[in-house]
């Protein structure tokens, strides 16, 4: 079992385990934050009120290609960004009215994940925790990344991670799953329990 992390990791520590932060503040995220916070009628019928809700960004023409272009230097150590195709794009919205704001340990159904923080206001908690190195079994160092509005976290989909509980505030994000064109298995996912 990995040791508990107590503080947010700096960008150098995150980069050492294969997680890169990219500044995307030049893009206008306000409309996308609003879209993330509005529950579609279909999802309203399916979602549990106590859970973070997700909206499908593929239907809303989210600028995924532009995000990938701006994150290309962060993606390049993993693969040539031109080899990637968008597998899925969705938003998540967390607020203190929800009863469960965690996302248990998991590996994403992607080769590369780009997680864009659309909005973060007065947030306590709600960090993304990474377990070990991206190519490991989840043991070893455990690092926590703060989600900063207008910034993206870029990581390998295989990197074991989870979202810690939101104690207070509001956070919305866009999650982009990218797979390699023509490669089978990039979309395999693993879901485990929450690690205290």
Question: What does each model-found stretch correspond to?
Answer:
Residues 79-195:
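Catalytic core of non-heme Fe(II) oxygenases with the double-stranded beta-helix
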Residues 1-83, 97-100:
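Non-heme Fe(II)/2-oxoglutarate
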């Amino acid at each position: 079992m990995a040791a508990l992390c107590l503080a947010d990791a700096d960008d150098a520590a995150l980069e050492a385990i294969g997680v890169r932060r990219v500044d995307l503040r030049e893009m206008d995220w306000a409309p996308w934050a609003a879209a993330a916070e509005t529950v579609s009628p279909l999802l309203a019928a399916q979602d549990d009120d106590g859970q973070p809700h997700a909206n499908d960004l593929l239907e809303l023409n989210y600028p995924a290609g532009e995000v990938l272009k701006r994150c290309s230097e962060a993606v390049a150590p993993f693969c040539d960004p031109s080899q990637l195709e968008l597998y899925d794009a969705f938003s998540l919205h967390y607020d203190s009215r929800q009863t469960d704001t965690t996302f248990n340990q998991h590996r994403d159904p992607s080769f590369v994940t780009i997680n864009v923080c659309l909005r973060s206001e007065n947030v306590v908690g709600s960090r993304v925790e990474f377990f070990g190195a991206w190519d490991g079994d989840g043991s070893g160092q455990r690092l926590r990344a703060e989600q900063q509005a207008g910034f993206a976290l870029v990581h390998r989909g295989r990197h074991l991670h989870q979202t810690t509980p939101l104690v207070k505030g509001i956070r919305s994000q866009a999650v982009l799953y990218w797979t390699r064109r023509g490669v089978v298995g990039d979309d395999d996912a693993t879901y485990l329990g929450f690690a205290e």
